[in-house]
Amino acid sequence: HMRNIRTLMNEAKRAGVIKESQYPFGKGLFEIKTGIGRKKGLTKKQLKAIFDYKSGNETTNRYKDLWIFIYLCNGINPTDMLKLKFSDIVDGEICFVRQKTERTTKNRKEIRATISVQMQAVIDKWGNKPLPDNYIFPYMKGNETAIEAKAITRDVVKRINKRMKLIGEELGIGNITTYTARHSYATVLKRSGVNISYISESLGHTD
């Protein structure tokens, strides 16, 4: 709920309804606590353990691979991942616009993620036939209502999180979620000394 309030306050600040001095969020002011498993990104060693992990259960391997795809595809949001089509692949790159920003022309930014060998392996193993009109992953059909699409996404995220929680416990890493993949992508780049503005751009954050 606090995140929704912050969004409204941001809008009010932008519209000039409230002054900067009246804005309640930020360092030294009110800070929104993050949930367990969201506090920090994984280390390279932990990521390697996840990448190397093999389960005897095919379902676990499938959702682990989708988690890896999220991480490698610039920490893509699951909503955007499930909407990717083969036509979004151009010259070895996946090009997409974050659903969060696609309605606002001002903030509309195309994200490009180079398809690595591991990403291609995930697509080859769990994806649809590589035809331009096909979704890369077999969850959306294309005729879903917005509510149905949201329900499908929520279900896939739930399945990924369930399997990753088990893997995290087995590897002694703790709770791992789709959010962890996105956060870890940014953290690894940051620790490697990559420019913050580049990280924001590759995640599709708006200014």
Model-derived segments and their meaning:
Residues 26-28, 83-125:
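Conserved tyrosine-mediated DNA breakage-rejoining catalytic core shared by Y-recombinases
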Residues 1-4, 43, 62-63, 115, ...:
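Hydrophobic (often cysteine-bearing) scaffold residues that line and stabilize catalytic clefts
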Residues 47, 116-174:
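Active-site/catalytic core of tyrosine-dependent DNA strand-transfer enzymes
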Residues 1-24:
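N-terminal DNA-binding recognition helix of tyrosine site-specific recombinases/integrases
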Residues 83-88, 200-207:
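A short, basic/aromatic helix-end/turn motif that makes direct DNA contacts
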Residues 161-201, 205:
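Short, basic (Lys/Arg/His-rich) helix/loop patches that form interaction surfaces
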Residues 20-78, 82:
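Basic, Lys/Arg- and aromatic-enriched nucleic-acid-binding interface segment
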